């Protein structure tokens, strides 16, 4: 692209990246030599090598035998002590994982004119949203990431509204994650003295599902920005499929240090969300995590968020409090909690205070 055109783009980043639908991917492909000021984050929000614990990582759990009590114990221990773990031999074929990744690339390689059909301004449903950064309209510093978010209601709605370039593989992958989610939650509920997930519990734990596809293009100055800022998820569980590039970092519980989550072929990264932290009365931990930008490679990831339904009341489960344990959190309407999360830029775990009993 001629330098004059590049200068024009840089003079109005919001128009090019957000309104025209090019995203940060389009910005990266201009051949930038330096990071635009809009993406420069304050030093305290950047991650340096001094902050990373190199000899520490989250557990990798073989779940080939879901019925083994030892597997359930490993899952519960990881949820209590780390909030993050990886699972292997989970039953989703490698071929399906690869198809989900390929679908991600297909969508983001579409022309900007096609992608922007799914922006807030253009898409006829709020259940599908193409965007860049997290909340670009209010953030002081933008995140180096594009994403497409798809809230699943039915196959019929997906067929009508989800992008054709990724729809079929995204729906298939999302459905394949349902069994894994259920098995994980069965194990986690055992640790909370919940012996059976009945219909009401199932709705509360996994009543709604959302799949995102994320694209992190290579960045000219990755040390000055973030792929995703510090945050915890508001889900019950998140199941993350990452590629082989790496870049996800997790805060160590009660420490300022961070651990890298190395890609493991065929694995899914599992993390506890705020909703499950609240339901477990703090026993299971929803942990801050972040994504670093990369100078050499484009990176993708595919998270599936397993959530309560918007009209569900989320609070400590009765089984958790049955022994007389004092509640740490008050019951909250899940849609109110979600609105609180989306009110401002990523800022660690501050959203959980919305439900905490003072």
From Swiss-Prot:
Entry's induction text: Transiently induced by fungal (F.oxysporum f.sp. batatas O-17) and chitosan treatments, in association with the accumulation of umbelliferone and its glucoside (skimmin) in the tubers.
Biological process, per Gene Ontology: coumarin biosynthetic process; phenylpropanoid biosynthetic process; response to fungus; response to molecule of fungal origin
Protein name as annotated: Bi-functional coumaroyl CoA and feruloyl CoA ortho-hydroxylase F6H2-2-1
Signal sequence segment: none
A GO molecular function held by the record: metal ion binding
PROSITE patterns registered for this protein in UniProt: FE2OG_OXY
Cofactor (UniProt): L-ascorbate; Fe(2+)
The protein's role, per its UniProt record: 2-oxoglutarate (OG)- and Fe(II)-dependent dioxygenase (2OGD) involved in scopoletin and umbelliferone biosynthesis. Converts feruloyl CoA into 6'-hydroxyferuloyl CoA, and p-coumaroyl CoA into 2,4-dihydroxycinnamoyl-CoA, but has no activity toward caffeoyl-CoA.
SUPFAM superfamilies recorded: Clavaminate synthase-like (SSF51197)
Protein family (similarity comment): Belongs to the iron/ascorbate-dependent oxidoreductase family.
Expressed in which tissues: Mostly expressed in underground stems and stems.
pH dependence statement: Optimum pH is 7.2.
Keyword Iron in annotation: yes
UniProt keywords, alphabetically: Dioxygenase, Iron, Metal-binding, Oxidoreductase
List of residues binding 2-oxoglutarate: 216, 299, 301
Species per Swiss-Prot/TrEMBL record: Ipomoea batatas
Residue span(s) of domain Fe2OG dioxygenase: 200-308
EC number: 1.14.11.61, 1.14.11.62
């Amino acid at each position: 692209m001629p330098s004059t055109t590049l200068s024009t783009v840089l003079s109005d980043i919001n128009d090019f990246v957000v309104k025209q639908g090019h995203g940060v991917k389009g910005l990266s492909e201009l051949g930038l030599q330096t990071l635009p000021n809009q993406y420069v984050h304050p030093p305290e929000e950047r991650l340096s090598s001094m902050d990373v614990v190199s000899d520490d990582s989250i557990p990798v759990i073989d779940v080939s035998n879901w019925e083994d009590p030892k597997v359930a114990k490993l899952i519960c221990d990881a949820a209590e002590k780390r909030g993050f773990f990886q699972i292997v031999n989970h039953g989703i074929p490698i071929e399906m994982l690869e198809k989900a990744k390929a679908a991600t690339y297909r969508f983001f390689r579409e022309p900007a004119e096609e992608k922007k059909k799914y922006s807030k301004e253009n898409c006829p449903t709020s259940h599908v949203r193409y965007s860049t950064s997290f909340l670009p309209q209010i953030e002081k510093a933008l995140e180096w990431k594009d994403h497409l978010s798809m809230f699943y209601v039915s196959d019929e709605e997906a067929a009508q509204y989800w992008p054709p370039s990724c729809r079929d593989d995204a729906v298939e992958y999302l459905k394949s994650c349902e069994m894994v989610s259920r098995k994980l939650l069965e194990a986690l509920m055992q640790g909370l003295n919940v012996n059976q997930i009945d219909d009401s519990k199932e709705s509360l734990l996994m009543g709604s599902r959302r799949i995102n596809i994320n694209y992190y293009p290579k960045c000219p100055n990755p040390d000055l920005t973030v792929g995703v800022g510090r945050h915890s998820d508001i889900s019950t569980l998140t199941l993350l499929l990452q590629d082989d590039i790496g870049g996800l970092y997790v805060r160590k519980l009660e420490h300022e240090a961070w651990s890298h989550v190395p890609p493991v072929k065929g694995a899914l990264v599992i993390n506890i969300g705020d909703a499950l932290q609240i339901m477990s009365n703090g026993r299971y931990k929803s942990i801050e995590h972040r994504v670093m930008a990369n100078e050499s490679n484009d990176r993708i990831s595919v998270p599936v968020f397993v959530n309560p339904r918007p009209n569900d009341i989320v609070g400590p489960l009765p089984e958790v409090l049955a022994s007389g344990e004092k509640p740490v959190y008050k019951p909250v309407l899940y849609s109110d909690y979600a609105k609180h999360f989306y009110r401002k830029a990523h800022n660690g775990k501050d959203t959980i205070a919305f439900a905490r009993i003072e």
